[in-house]
């Protein structure tokens, strides 16, 4: 591990030097690439330098144990105890920092929520989930932009797609893909019986044009008039756009904007992300079940979480986490869940890597 850390520190110094090179500064695209690399490396280097100081401190304190003065010996023992704990903490931190980084972690995401079983109640729960994620994004300083939405007649959401932009968005949202189940008494239920409904969530990293090539001849473009929740036309021009990727059958619609051009641009963003996701899912399917992370599999059919309103309980089934904080979680305070999932995933990765 120490050899790897020395290599990281050397690369950090190289990048630091490159950032002061006038040629690099003059090319903003290249400059920004090195700025991002510098930021990533700095986390490892800071921890490594602190670790080296702790090792030096331990050596000095062990030397003081040879001192004839008993008071100095006692102080040295106390310092060794403290530094031993620091050494363990920093070694654990460095192991995680040295894990291979998910190349998508810093990407923006396209968040898709679809109402599943449960009729109108599933649509209302889909709207609740979207509010929860939107509020969480706001607390992190991220921007949420609706790309397309199909509303139900009772204030729910049949299907919604939104772009969430900011630093590290995918790293926080990537474990949210799957089936989310709700248990509660619907507002329409006169007998007070608890119903179970479900929604599926898909989190797709934003795909740049370089990530996936799409042949324009393989896309069928249909235009039509935008419709409201009840099916009525809300626009007098054919501004809504439906894109069909013929080889895969993936269909994307967008009708939120009044401009056909803007709707097509938004639909292309979603299509590109879905096609990249389609390729990744196919690749994951070829990986043996033993090697695929339970937390990070992103299986859409996997029931990942239950929100039980009568008990005020939220349970994440993948890691056995139960929190009796449903109200604050639905208000967007999901950091505790995100952190627990990340910790679990890191522990899995460390075990797999034999660290």
Curated annotation (Swiss-Prot):
<comment type="function">
    <text>Peptide chain release factor 1 directs the termination of translation in response to the peptide chain termination codons UAG and UAA.</text>
</comment>
<protein>
    <recommendedName>
        <fullName>Peptide chain release factor 1</fullName>
    </recommendedName>
</protein>
<comment type="similarity">
    <text>Belongs to the prokaryotic/mitochondrial release factor family.</text>
</comment>
<keyword id="KW-0488">Methylation</keyword>
<dbReference type="InterPro" id="IPR005139">
    <property type="entry name" value="PCRF"/>
</dbReference>
<dbReference type="Pfam" id="PF03462">
    <property type="entry name" value="PCRF"/>
</dbReference>
<keyword id="KW-0648">Protein biosynthesis</keyword>
<dbReference type="Pfam" id="PF00472">
    <property type="entry name" value="RF-1"/>
</dbReference>
<dbReference type="InterPro" id="IPR045853">
    <property type="entry name" value="Pep_chain_release_fac_I_sf"/>
</dbReference>
<feature type="compositionally biased region" description="Basic and acidic residues">
    <location>
        <begin position="289"/>
        <end position="305"/>
    </location>
</feature>
<feature type="modified residue" description="N5-methylglutamine">
    <location>
        <position position="232"/>
    </location>
</feature>
<dbReference type="GO" id="GO:0005737">
    <property type="term" value="C:cytoplasm"/>
</dbReference>
<dbReference type="GO" id="GO:0016149">
    <property type="term" value="F:translation release factor activity, codon specific"/>
</dbReference>
<dbReference type="InterPro" id="IPR000352">
    <property type="entry name" value="Pep_chain_release_fac_I"/>
</dbReference>
<dbReference type="InterPro" id="IPR050057">
    <property type="entry name" value="Prokaryotic/Mito_RF"/>
</dbReference>
<feature type="region of interest" description="Disordered">
    <location>
        <begin position="282"/>
        <end position="309"/>
    </location>
</feature>
<dbReference type="InterPro" id="IPR004373">
    <property type="entry name" value="RF-1"/>
</dbReference>
<keyword id="KW-0963">Cytoplasm</keyword>
